[in-house]
Amino acid sequence: MEPTAPSLTEEDLTEVKKDALENLRVYLCEKIIAERHFDHLRAKKILSREDTEEISCRTSSRKRAGKLLDYLQENPKGLDTLVESIRREKTQNFLIQKITDEVLKLRNIKLEHLKGLKCSSCEPFPDGATNNLSRSNSDESNFSEKLRASTVMYHPEGESSTTPFFSTNSSLNLPVLEVGRTENTIFSSTTLPRPGDPGAPPLPPDLQLEEEGTCANSSEMFLPLRSRTVSRQ
């Protein structure tokens, strides 16, 4: 169900018309001849005879028009009656358009203001939802910190290691807790240099002598075999 559009009350419309007269005061004081509208305004009970006499006491046309606008602002129907009088005169219809445009402009501004107040008063979440959301975020943060603290382990070197889901190196796809076993496997499968290879440690003296003796007699060990093979043929 769509929300209803805001509407202006009678008080709002009266305020709009009063503001329109105030905004156009300088312009209307130059264009309006107050005496031309006395009869119609008195017939509609907008002005009294005393009011017209008070207006007529002003020394200039602009001052008389200004005093007339003062009386019209005090009456909720003052502006409407002035427009009717101008229409009856048929000589200043451009004033009607000017007044109408100003009233419509102020009316739209008032409606936008009321619409903004209505939107700001609407709660996007149910009562207490914002508090519950902030409380939930706080609980999750506390739980995460506690979980992180409970899973941290320290190696002899002082390096810290956390559980697999806190590991930042996801490309390895290896649990952090198994790093030690993985390293052991790598080191155990690496081939060590053999005696005599570059980088191999020197052999003890007794092993060197034994190895040299073995190499010197290797040809003699195979001679009897070859001699026996030849004799059989």
Swiss-Prot record:
| Phosphoserine sites (modified residues) | S138
- Known consequence of changing L47A? Abolishes cell death-inducing capability
Q: Where in the cell is it found?
A: Cytoplasm, Perinuclear region; Membrane raft
Task: Quote the tissue specificity entry.
Answer: Ubiquitous.
The record lists the effect of L41A as: Abolishes cell death-inducing capability
Q: Could you say what the effect of mutating L174S is?
A: Found in a MALT lymphoma sample; uncertain significance
Report the outcome of V230I. Found in a MALT lymphoma sample; uncertain significance
Consequence when changing K17R: Decreased linear ubiquitination and impaired ability to activate NF-kappa-B
What's the impact of mutating I46A? Abolishes cell death-inducing capability
Biased region (Pro residues) positions are 195-205
Q: Which residues carry this modification: N-acetylmethionine?
A: M1
Entry keyword set: Acetylation, Adaptive immunity, Apoptosis, Chromosomal rearrangement, Cytoplasm, Disease variant, Immunity, Innate immunity, Isopeptide bond, Membrane, Phosphoprotein, Tumor suppressor, Ubl conjugation
Outcome, altering K31E: Found in a MALT lymphoma sample; uncertain significance
Q: What would changing V16E do, according to UniProt? A: Found in a MALT lymphoma sample; uncertain significance
What are the site positions for Cleavage? R228, T229
GO cellular component labels:
CBM complex; cytoplasm; cytoplasmic microtubule; cytosol; immunological synapse; lysosome; membrane raft; nucleoplasm
- According to the UniProt record, what happens if one changes L28A? Abolishes cell death-inducing capability
Q: What is the effect of changing G78R?
A: Abolishes NF-kappa-B activation
Output the PTM entry.
Phosphorylated. Phosphorylation results in dissociation from TRAF2 and binding to BIRC2/c-IAP2. Phosphorylated by IKBKB/IKKB. Ubiquitinated via both 'Lys-63'-linked and linear ('Met-1'-linked) polyubiquitin chains in response to T-cell receptor (TCR) activation. Ubiquitination is recognized by IKBKG/NEMO, the regulatory subunit of I-kappa-B kinase (IKK), and is required for TCR-induced NF-kappa-B activation. Linear ubiquitination at Lys-17, Lys-31 and Lys-63 is mediated by RNF31/HOIP; linear ubiquitination is recognized with much higher affinity than 'Lys-63'-linked ubiquitin by IKBKG/NEMO. CARD11 is required for linear ubiquitination by HOIP by promoting the targeting of BCL10 to RNF31/HOIP.
What this chain does, per the entry, is described as: Plays a key role in both adaptive and innate immune signaling by bridging CARD domain-containing proteins to immune activation. Acts by channeling adaptive and innate immune signaling downstream of CARD domain-containing proteins CARD9, CARD11 and CARD14 to activate NF-kappa-B and MAP kinase p38 (MAPK11, MAPK12, MAPK13 and/or MAPK14) pathways which stimulate expression of genes encoding pro-inflammatory cytokines and chemokines.
The protein here is known as B-cell lymphoma/leukemia 10
Q: Which organism is the protein's source? A: Homo sapiens
